[in-house]
UniProtKB/Swiss-Prot annotation:
Keywords recorded for this protein, A-Z: ATP-binding, Ligase, Metal-binding, Nucleotide-binding, Queuosine biosynthesis, Zinc
Class of the enzyme per the UniProt entry, highest EC level: ligase
Function: Catalyzes the ATP-dependent conversion of 7-carboxy-7-deazaguanine (CDG) to 7-cyano-7-deazaguanine (preQ(0)).
Source species: Actinobacillus pleuropneumoniae serotype 5b (strain L20)
UniProt gene name: queC
Protein name: 7-cyano-7-deazaguanine synthase
Pfam families per the UniProt record, alphabetical: QueC
Cofactor annotation: Zn(2+)
């Protein structure tokens, strides 16, 4: 088996996972990076279309995994036509078990390919109240997968403690700011270019405006 270090990115075609993809490419080289995309029954096909387009455009191998069986056992606004709202501490866009499932399937795939490093774009700084975006969950899952498969995975979460403003700054540092701004899809409602009103769009645009304001201010002070 090839001993060259490789990485796989859990990839949705959104801002966060695309930022992780650019970081993985910078660290490992584009020829040593793959992406895994999940069809979990999401309401809008645009998410899958964007992911496929970006993977092809950047020249990385994409593997699509169907986990839509989850739709048969849980209900939420990401997969069904429900109004997006907060339910207690967790919004109804939360898909129970999604990130656990994504990490498990990605790890199974990665081991078969001889890959140890897994990138995921989860974040608990500006996170939407999703329990499976927390660092404690990812670290726990890393230990569980290592024990379950007798294999040393390294789950990387480069965005874990970054605000959205800082995530835009990282994209800029990676030379991917314009690409991510133009080509990624984040909108919960599936609107091309964003609806500007759903929680995901609001968070993305708030971080973008904060970063651009800070960048412009910094340039004026030089």
């Amino acid at each position: 088996m090839n001993s060259t270090p490789k990485a796989v990115v859990i990839f949705s075609g959104g801002q966060d996972s695309t930022t992780c993809l650019f970081q993985a490419i910078q660290e490992f080289g584009v020829e040593n990076v793959e992406v895994v995309t999940f069809q979990y029954g999401q309401r809008h096909a645009i998410e899958l279309e964007k992911a496929a387009w970006i993977a092809k455009d950047l020249g990385v191998k994409q593997t699509l995994i169907d986990t839509s069986v989850i739709k048969a056992i849980t209900s939420n606004a990401m997969m069904e036509e429900h109004e997006i709202k907060q339910e207690g501490n967790t919004p109804n866009t939360f898909v129970d078990g999604r990130n656990a499932l994504f990490l498990l399937y990605t790890a199974i795939y990665a081991k078969g390919q001889g890959i140890r490093t897994i990138f995921t774009g989860v974040c608990e700084t500006d996170f939407s109240g999703y329990p499976d975006c927390r660092d404690v969950f990812v670290k726990s899952m890393n230990v569980t997968l290592n024990l379950a498969m007798d294999y040393n995975f390294n789950i990387r979460t480069p965005l874990m403690y970054l605000t959205k403003k800082q995530t835009w700054a990282l994209a800029d540092k990676l030379g991917a700011f314009d690409y991510i701004r133009q080509h990624t899809h984040t909108c919960y409602l599936g609107v091309e270019g964003g609806c500007h009103t759903c929680p995901s769009c609001v968070l993305r645009e708030k971080g973008l405006n904060e970063y651009l304001s800070e960048k412009t201010s910094g340039q004026k002070n030089v």
